[in-house]
Amino acid sequence: MQIILLEKVVNLGNLGDVVKVKDGYARNFLIPQGKAKRANQANLAEFEARRAELERQQAEKLAAAQEVGAKLEGLMVQIARKAGMDGRLFGSVTNADVAEALAAQGFEIERSTVRMPDGPLKQIGDTQLEVALHSDVVVSITVSVLGEQQQ
């Protein structure tokens, strides 16, 4: 299916690009999330009429992400969980837990933006994680998992 991108999409293209993608990817992900429209004459004309507005919105989103990224870069988040004597957690720390801890510090981010390349954290200690605020803004934070005292 041919689509027009309404914003930058990682590994696909930039604002205004007409690209060919699989039908399911377009119908189930890109179009419902407002990232793309079908490429037909009417939508192409509408896009060209709104191009300046869309570019301005993209620039505003990027500036906001860079501003939050500057505050978030290098931040340390502490999360306490019950752990055994050997340092293994009873359970794990997921990206939702990290997003919740960041929200407690005043940063409203989606849990899907927290990247955990090795999966959920299952050990006590410090771990470097990435937060993708925008396709062009990826910052690094440190998550310190602490063991709670057992009674």
From Swiss-Prot:
Pfam families: Ribosomal_L9_C (PF03948), Ribosomal_L9_N (PF01281). GO terms for cellular component: ribonucleoprotein complex; ribosome. Keywords: Ribonucleoprotein, Ribosomal protein, RNA-binding, rRNA-binding. GO terms for biological process: translation. GO terms for molecular function: rRNA binding; structural constituent of ribosome. Binds to the 23S rRNA. Belongs to the bacterial ribosomal protein bL9 family. This is Large ribosomal subunit protein bL9. It comes from Azoarcus sp. (strain BH72).
